Amino acid sequence: IICDDIPYFLLFNLHNDIYRTWHIYKWTPTRSLMSEEWSQSPENTLLSLRHGITHSDGIELDIRLTSDNELIVHHDSVVSIPKDRLDGRSKWVESWTLEELKQQGFCSLDDLLNDSVIENQWIEQGKMVCLEFKRPHFMSPKGRGLFKKSRQVNTLSTAMKIAESKLDERGIPNQNSVFYSFYKGMKNIIDEQSISRNWAGLLPSVPTIGTRT
């Protein structure tokens, strides 16, 4: 699997239908994969993900839960826009609604599922899509803070359950997706929520501090 922002992490203990150990390698676009006219789109946009799934064996999505319990494709814990565009709003992704984030140019999981190119590649062409569920920042309203570890777990649990429901509704084959997170408590969430999708825990278990968690 090739991804554009994960350098040399190891997936381990991939469960359910697939019992293999996979390596994820950092992808550097080359001209052999694309035409002279191609220019790289910003990461985690519909255009970049459409290009990625068309020209590779699969793609990775960074999934976060919005304030209205929708799923947005967004890597960083803070909204990836210039500070002067925050207009006094919270910087944490989980504080924004789906519509507010889409107005800033970010795409949702529904946008991907509604895209005919991605749907064809994902289902008909058998491409793999890895969904990395991002834990909210320590200080985010959906984060754990000092004494609210359960809040963080609830955020991940809700996001995974919603994602599973959406993929099931669209008929995404189980073997064409995997849920994962840099979180040592993945198994507990999978068991408690009865998630049937393939899943994996990632190492290391990344602390929820900084801006690129």
Where are these predicted regions, by residue range?
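Phosphate-group recognition and catalysis centered on beta-loop-alpha active-site segments
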Residues: 1-213
